[in-house]
Amino acid sequence: MKFIVSSTYLLKQLQVLGGVINNSNTLPILDNFLFDLDNNKLTVSASDLETTMSSVLDVDSDNEGTIAVPARLLLETLKTFPEQPLTFVVEDNNTVEISSNHGKYALAYADGAEFPKAVELANPSSTTLLGDILATAIDKTIFAAGNDDLRPVMSGVFFQFSTENLTFVATDAHKLVKYQRTDVTASQVAEFIMPKKPLTLLKGILAGSESDVVIEYNDSNAKFSFENTELICRLIDGKYPNYEAVIPKENPNVLSIARNQFLSSVKRVAIFSNKTTHQIRLKIAGAELNISAEDIDYSNKAEERLTCSYQGDDMQIGFNSRFLTEMLNNLNSDDVSLEMSLPNRAGILTPIDGLDEGEHVTMLVMPVMLNS
């Protein structure tokens, strides 16, 4: 088995696939890339059993063969090469020899047959959307997903497809984000929960991408195919909570304010808040928003006044500043609106501008009880 490939082209593809490989694997074979050569097409795969990702590369060869190559060793070697052709030759003594312009490097390989086979999706449904739209949907939601192993359904992002729109939801019970696109639809209704790891990989690869992504899915797995790459992952098993039920419908009190001004004020005041609750207080009266925090244990306190536009009754409401900061950071609008009903009901944060046609973002943040 022998092939010739550009060093930088191979490195670029392997760095993408390397994100799948865990630092410590129970199965040693998973520390490898699977190289499957079929004449001038080399398919490289990486897996952690839950997620498998593979790319098809163009190489110069007229051989066939399958080997598993140590991922970390190969990546470290490739990073040091300037652009040049590399020749890979599989020797009889169980090593693969790489020849560059200046030297030869031999590394031991494992039998490719030991590498776990990727799942074939049985009777999948499919939906196609632009890579950048998927990357944005992941970016806007994934930060709100939980980390609680006891509630695995909340540790992923809920994909909800219909013939009218595509909706992506994430929540950890303290905050919730719903991102909706009405400019993209599916041929039939479907819903599934995607784990964080494959989504993080997809987000990194697809940001700014103009190519289409085909999403195929059934009850247990999902497959994302784009350009020369495909990613297959196991879905999170379980039923997603009824998130619509927690979004308050009647919110008579509406605050509108410049996002950056609100964000920097919350960040500053939060420095003086209690280190366990991170509680800040919003007090709104007329066109004035008063943001304050106090850490009674250390006699630290801070207060800022901002002008805002507000319709509704004067009110005071407490929030965890970390959640509020995360959400404001994740929006890119100039102005935001915060809709509230009562101090013990969730606040709804939405961007006022800066959205594409057909793009809708709703963020929900649970209040914290104010100690008077």
Where are these regions (language model features)?
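Structural preference for solvent-exposed beta-strand-turn elements
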Residues: M1-S372
